[in-house]
Amino acid sequence: MKSITQLENKKVLVLGLAKSGEAAARLLAKLGAIVTVNDGKAFEENPSAQSLLEEGIKVVCGGHPLELLDENFELMVKNPGIRYDNPMVARALEKEIPVWTEVELAYLVSEAPIIGITGSNGKTTTTTMIADVLNHGGKSGVLSGNIGFPASEVAQSVTNQDTLVMELSSFQLMGIESFHPHIAVITNLMPTHIDYHGSFEEYVAAKWNIQNEMTSDDFIILNFNQDLAKELATQTNAQVVPFSTVEKVDGAYLENGGLYFKGELLMHADELGVPGSHNVENALATIAVAKLSGVSNQAIKETLSSFGGVKHRLQFVDTIDDVKFYNDSKSTNILATQKALSGFDNSKVILIAGGLDRGNEFDELIPDITGLKKMVILGESAPRVKRAADKTGVTYLDAKDVADATRIAFEQASAGDVVLLSPANASWDMYKNFEVRGDEFITTVERLKG
């Protein structure tokens, strides 16, 4: 971690906890800032706040009192999900207090160069592809950001031998100042999150912040299937590397079923481990990053051919209306589900659990399911899983099978949430094996997407 002094003895308000807020508060304290955390959840129901208080960090819970801002804070670090019309944020801006998100902190302390990936669709898949390709090519890509690993936490442990591969939302990119990736990727730009940003133009502007500090030594990878991307390409200091599935470009492109980079054939589209035209675009963006990073053609082909091939093991399935679906049907025991949940912010997770009743109780799972947004419970073991859920106060709903559970979970989800199938039970009460169970989840997600 870089040793920085600019935050020493500065009064900083962290607004909103969850994993990113908790990580930011700890990092700020480590950097010598005078930290106050403000979270809407009551202290008694807020293990994160309790933990921070034990570490000597001031916490104010149960609401967002505007008078808190009378304490002459010099910086606010807010949870990206909190809108800018929130009274606390609006008041901070009125008082000319800078408002950051935790990715700015991550940049300040990271010794590793950053590859930042944003866009409307395909962010998570592309981010994961890039990290996998770098690692297979011997380059050490470390996942962080909106993919479930707080950037400000991960950034503390990387070195200049690593590369931070960071998924970035428009919400996060609104709160940056000096953030400077060496390579940026914008997968595509579609009208989403207009309720948050107010207009498509403001949404695009937030995404475009990713390149604000980039120079001619840096690279931005843009989807030239879109005229908007071609227009934006004229408005950056970074070197533009385009990708396209509809035309030959000076970058990565699809031609006669082949995936090329600057005239060189790397592989064929039908060799990709994941189907769909959107995944061809994701693969082309990944190829561009990999070639700029010095990864061999063989490593690129091997990674992209096998990507997505290991199904049912915390497999990212798709995103619908900004709700991410993960298939972890292989989680047939409590430990596996504990590992799956450890990578997510519980307040955003709707967990689908239950299956074969082996007579065991689920008390071991209580710390891990505490704070979940909701659970959808099914199978023979449902009464036992519910007993554990009752001890946490988590709301749960019943489902007759995985398809029903997936539909119910999606109905309960909001933008930014995760629907996670991680049953903590074997499948044999309803399904031949965990593969069949996972396939039903995948098929249902496909039907929901239409």
Swiss-Prot record:
Q: Which family does it belong to?
A: Belongs to the MurCDEF family.
Q: What is its EC number?
A: 6.3.2.9
Intrachain S-S bonds: none
Query: What exactly does this protein do?
Result: Cell wall formation. Catalyzes the addition of glutamate to the nucleotide precursor UDP-N-acetylmuramoyl-L-alanine (UMA).
Pathway-wise, it operates in: Cell wall biogenesis; peptidoglycan biosynthesis
Subcellular location as annotated: Cytoplasm
- Pfam families with a match to the protein in the record: Mur_ligase_C, Mur_ligase_M, MurD-like_N
GO cellular component terms given for this protein: cytoplasm
Q: Any idea what this protein is called?
A: UDP-N-acetylmuramoylalanine--D-glutamate ligase
Q: Which residues form a coiled coil?
A: none
Q: Which gene encodes it?
A: murD
PANTHER family given for it?
A: UDP-N-ACETYLMURAMOYLALANINE--D-GLUTAMATE LIGASE
Q: Which UniProt keywords apply?
A: ATP-binding, Cell cycle, Cell division, Cell shape, Cell wall biogenesis/degradation, Cytoplasm, Ligase, Nucleotide-binding, Peptidoglycan synthesis
Give the binding site residues for ATP: 119-125
Q: What is its main location?
A: cytoplasm
Q: Which Gene3D superfamilies match?
A: Mur ligase, C-terminal domain (3.90.190.20), Mur-like, catalytic domain (3.40.1190.10), NAD(P)-binding Rossmann-like Domain (3.40.50.720)
Q: Name one GO molecular function term.
A: ATP binding
NCBIfam families to which the protein is assigned, alphabetical:
murD
Range of residues in the leader sequence: none
Q: Which reaction does it catalyse?
A: UDP-N-acetyl-alpha-D-muramoyl-L-alanine + D-glutamate + ATP = UDP-N-acetyl-alpha-D-muramoyl-L-alanyl-D-glutamate + ADP + phosphate + H(+)
